[in-house]
Amino acid sequence: MTRGAGGETVAWSYFCRDVVPFTAMVAVECVTVGSNTLFKAATLRGLSFYVFVFYTYVVATLVLLPLSLIFGRSKRLPSAKTPVFFNIFLLALVGFMSLIVGCKGIEYSSPTLASAISNLTPAFTFTLAVIFRMEQIVLRSSATQAKIIGTIVSISGALVVILYKGPKVLTDASLTPPSPTISLYQHLTSFDSSWIIGGLLLATQYLLVSVWYILQTRVMELYPEEITVVFLYNLCATLISAPVCLFAEKDLNSFILKPGVSLASVMYSGGLVSSFGSVIHTWGLHLKGPVYISLFKPLSIVIAVAMGVMFLGDALYLGSVIGSLILSLGFYTVIWGKAREDSIKTVAGTEQSPLLPSHTIEEEASLSCD
């Protein structure tokens, strides 16, 4: 009986520690790409990205308010004069800027490009961690060499995706086929300025996302309450976005949303991505760390391609395929370097985590199943 109970305990611990986080992160990637696709469809019908950003934070705040009151733990809310509140406000400012830049980038390009560029996140995070002395560089270490090489390869892949669009390799059957008079040479030598601008904006977004990860880690160390932190984050982002978006959007009538794809995109983004998606990301960051979360980024490319072709009639371009392959190679090189570094530290008996403290198996199971 004891043995059976022990086996059940181990199985339950594995389920809470590995299966639940994995399923949650896959679901978040699907929801995020779905939000990008829906937003792109809404912008094609005239939705202003300022309106989208403002209402996204408003909806997320309203959704999380009752949840923070119901599921909030006994820890008191941080005072406005404490470092916790200042860090949450700074987190909201960075998150607001990243969402504004990202929405504009998708307007210029596509959700598929956004998913491809998102693979820069680990490289950016590593670079920022080095700059802020949160990561140690030992040039003779294979782990450090892998992270440096992976960062360079990732940036190279992003440049390919941004600067080289190339011919179509996959398109919706309902789209008009390209003219046979357009030569491959014209595809190779042509530059789409909108595509390049969109790519640069999206690269800026994921640089800000990397900054957001580091700040979020600091907040969770000071105040480890996921739902409350995300609620305060969205509340501060709402207060920041209100004057900016109302000033930037000259047509106030655009803030009146009628039933349709525009209203659906706002409700979807605020009700799922900025609220529950942010809570799951924060929980996963606290439980597994930022490297684990970033492992799921390449999955978003496949999801974005499928959704873009099916719902937007987007085409898949050769440059995106080649660049995404290079990006993924660099991405997994950085991840291998990080995993190698962690294994060396484990063997050496050191317990050092640059972004978040590690958890024991029992603590992880408790965190994941709370």
From Swiss-Prot:
Q: Indicate the family of this protein.
A: Belongs to the drug/metabolite transporter (DMT) superfamily. Plant drug/metabolite exporter (P-DME) (TC 2.A.7.4) family.
Principal place of residence = membrane
Q: Does the keyword Membrane apply?
A: yes
The record ties this protein, via PANTHER family, to: WAT1-RELATED PROTEIN
Q: Does the keyword Cytoplasm apply?
A: no
Q: Name one Pfam family in it.
A: EamA
UniProt keyword annotations, A-Z: Membrane, Repeat, Transmembrane, Transmembrane helix
Q: Provide the protein name.
A: WAT1-related protein At5g40230
Per the database record, which ranges form the EamA domain?
Answer: 33-162, 210-335
Q: Where in the cell is it found?
A: Membrane
Please give the InterPro entries that the UniProt record associates with this protein: EamA_dom, WAT1-related
Transmembrane feature ranges: 19-39, 51-71, 83-103, 112-132, 143-163, 195-215, 227-247, 260-280, 292-311, 315-337
The cellular component terms of Gene Ontology attached to this UniProt record, alphabetical and capped at eight, are: membrane
Q: Which GO terms describe its molecular function?
A: transmembrane transporter activity
Its membrane topology, per UniProt?
A: Multi-pass membrane protein
